[in-house]
Amino acid sequence: MHPANRRRGRAPLLTVVVLPICLVVVAACAPAASQPSPATTQAQVRPVATSGLSPTTAPTRRPQSTPLEPDPAQVRLRLDSVATGLDRPVFATDAGDGSGRLFVVEKGGTIRILDGGRLLARPFLDIRDRVLSRGSEQGLLGLAFAPDFQRSGYFYVDYIDRSGNTVISRFQAGKSANSADSGSEFKVLGIDQPASNHNGGMLAFGPDGYLYVGTGDGGREGDPFHNGQNPQTLLGKLLRLDVTTDPTKPYTIPPSNPWVTAKYNGQAVLPEIWAIGLRNPWRFSFDRKTGDLWIGDVGQNTYEEIDRIAAGAGGRVQGGLNFGWSIMEGMHCYPDTATCSRAGLTLPVAEYTHGADGCSITGGYVYRGTAIPGLVGAYIYGDYCSGRIWALTPAAGGAWQSQLLLDSGLAISSFGQDQAGELYVVDLGGAVYRLA
């Protein structure tokens, strides 16, 4: 997750292949409303031009000849409050059941429901008795509904148990549509944690129907346990599990996982692993139109990074990649005094340095809604420390450029996406906002 003590007042240079031009902030978000009914904030900014492609290449705008091109510079973004009074919310998602409900994960161990703009008083799930949330990166951290949730009632959570270890469990909705059976817990996977931070926590079903799990490197500083590049640990990885083919088993290994039979640099790899070399992939998502995978991987002392895996045939992403940690932090050798080889590594599509703009990336989603046409196809992400929100879009020459959309002033713990493709900002301080 993110630091407990937010470090504000440091500006990142949004790097697209190489270091770009610094962004400018011109407005901030007003405080959240005091009641859960929808209310428009006063958060609006004037868009500004951003990132060049290299020190010698001027920024190039993509032609705006078609409305299908994302055009963040024309967007006047605001945040509409949809819920307040939450207890340290860290995620929001829909169930894919057509109900229009939004499910909000609270760090302490509860899941709340937003239904028709109203925050229901009774939690959908309450497992506070099983969750350790004392540490800043501990708690109930992730939620994913099974693709067949409407039929099976199954959903999956990622939490830190009372012993300080990661647990991924399946639960089932109860007789009421707005409550789950806390006694239905079926443990899918447990991972021992050597420290209290870098716990990952994101769960998401991919277009292939498999459950993807993001794990941190085990914590402390600089990967002292050497987990990022260790193929014999599940820490510092992206996992891919089949949890739906046989619901009587915790999971099975998809036969197409990259290291079921193959080795990595001559070493055997745990078959659950889909990709290696991640530090703390706190939030990742799949583009619901293309199937592309986007990862916001929280950096160490200097760089925050965005990784993208373009989907291939059938809208599926390639496994077997190494995102570099702790050989590299972002696009740079780690530590910065070291020399390293990039051979065999998948580098980020964008990075930014720690500074006034932030210190801890919060990965988001490619916008596929209808309320903000200028953002369709843009990857929306933010920073927990600064509260800034950006749009990342393709630029000339296969590079990427970032556009500052808003300086929200919020502790952005997550973004959320509803069934219509509209996006939400989750504020750890206790509120959820809709991008509008």
Residue ranges with predicted function:
Residues 30-32:
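Bacterial signal peptide processing site
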Residues 47, 52-222, 283-286, 291-302, ...:
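Acidic, Gly/Ser/Thr-rich repeat motifs that build Ca2+-stabilized beta-propeller blades
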Residues 52-78, 119, 177-181, 248-266, ...:
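Blade/loop signatures of beta-propeller domains
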Residues 278, 399-419:
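Conserved blade-ending motifs and adjacent loop-strand segments that build the rim/top face
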